């Protein structure tokens, strides 16, 4: 058993673990978050990031499978019949796996499947682990935590709730608590119970060892506080993001978010800060977001005209992406409310090509765009007639 454990650990498993680390770093480096919405706790929650690191994760899975196939020990150890069995002995003899290191290979396989977005395969792996290591509370607890995460990421919240409820009835091993902090945070974020997510997110941030991921989690905490109306807490969370010295895009978005949660009555200070950001050469790529933030502040102050002007400035910037799509959507909504349907149609048509079809408001956007396809020619004709009539009423000098 010792020799099989040694071989598992230092040969096959080591290579698989290294591939897993390489895949995780590739995913972390290439991940692009959509900062206009709550960012996911795990980068695999971003659909566009799922294929990142896939080849490395596949290699990790292959190595884990090889370790399990070559080094599994199913044979029960011999026991002297006249020797009295303790509870510990009974647990030992009831095990289904006697290689003391092999559970790590199972965990490596399941986590690799999870991070490449193969949630059903990962769930099957962790469910099997749960059955195999039922008597070993630490391993069992970790496997159940990951099983719940698989269900959460698939949107199977009732299944996740069932795993969580059953785990609450069992006595949780202290070595599994860390994994469950992540699971609870992810669960409450997906169910929209943001107030319940906060304490677990705070624990997750303390657990996190990777600097960039910690910065993401702090940003997410700031977003949650902002959604709960806790402006000061949100501002401080975004400030903590900046202090971690994260990649520039994350730092920039944290600074933008700070302007949106500053105390009421500080509109001039917020606008001034955003104008200063717009003047910086470092932010040329992100000007659509700067003007979008300005527009939001004007809109909060019920200055619709100033909001439209700010959004229009952002619209003229060359970058095309989700952020610009959200700006165009909001600008189109303002034009729709003002019955300037020709302008609304242009915004909606451009936004349709930039936004994800999974957005909650995408269907409404699509419906409005179809309505305007039929309505816009008539409204344009009416506006032209109104303009001609106004022109006819003017004197020759005014013309």
Region spans (language model):
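Acidic, polar-rich low-complexity tracts and alpha-helical solenoid repeat scaffolds
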Residues: 1-399
């Amino acid at each position: 058993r010792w020799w099989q454990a040694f071989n598992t650990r230092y040969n096959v498993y080591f290579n698989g673990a290294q591939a897993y680390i390489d895949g995780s770093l590739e995913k972390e480096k290439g991940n692009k978050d959509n900062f206009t919405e709550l960012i996911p706790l795990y980068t695999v929650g971003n659909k566009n990031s799922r294929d990142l690191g896939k080849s490395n994760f596949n290699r990790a899975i292959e190595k884990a499978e090889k370790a399990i196939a070559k080094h599994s020990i199913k044979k029960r150890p011999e026991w002297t019949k006249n020797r009295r069995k303790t509870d510990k002995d009974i647990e030992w003899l009831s095990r289904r796996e006697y290689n003391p290191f092999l559970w790590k290979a199972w965990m490596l396989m399941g986590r690799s499947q999870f991070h490449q977005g193969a949630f059903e395969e990962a769930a099957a792996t962790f469910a099997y682990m749960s059955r195999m290591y039922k008597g070993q509370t630490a391993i069992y607890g970790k496997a159940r935590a990951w099983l719940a995460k698989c269900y959460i990421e698939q949107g199977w919240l009732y299944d996740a709730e069932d795993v969580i409820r059953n785990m609450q009835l069992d006595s949780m091993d202290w070595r599994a608590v860390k994994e469950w902090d992540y699971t609870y945070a992810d669960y409450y974020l997906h169910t929209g119970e943001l107030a319940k997510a906060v304490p677990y997110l705070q624990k997750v941030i303390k657990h996190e060892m990777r600097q960039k991921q910690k910065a993401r989690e702090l940003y997410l905490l700031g977003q949650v506080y902002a959604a709960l109306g806790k402006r000061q807490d949100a501002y401080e969370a975004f400030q903590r993001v900046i202090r971690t010295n994260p990649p520039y895009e994350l730092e920039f978005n944290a600074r933008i978010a700070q302007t949106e949660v500053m105390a009421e009555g500080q509109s001039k200070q917020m606008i001034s800060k955003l104008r200063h950001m717009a003047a910086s050469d470092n932010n040329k790529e992100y000007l659509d977001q700067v003007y979008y933030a300005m527009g939001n502040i004007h809109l909060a102050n019920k200055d619709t005209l100033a909001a439209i002007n700010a959004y229009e400035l952002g619209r003229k910037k060359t970058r095309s992406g989700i952020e610009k799509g959200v700006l165009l959507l909001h600008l189109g909504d303002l034009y729709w409310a003002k019955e300037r349907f020709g302008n609304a149609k242009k915004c909606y048509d451009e936004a349709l090509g930039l936004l994800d079809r999974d957005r909650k408001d995408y269907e409404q956007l699509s419906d409005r765009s179809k309505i305007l396809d039929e309505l816009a020619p008539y409204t344009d004709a009416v506006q032209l007639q109104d303009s001609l009539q106004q022109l006819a009423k003017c004197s020759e000098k005014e013309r």
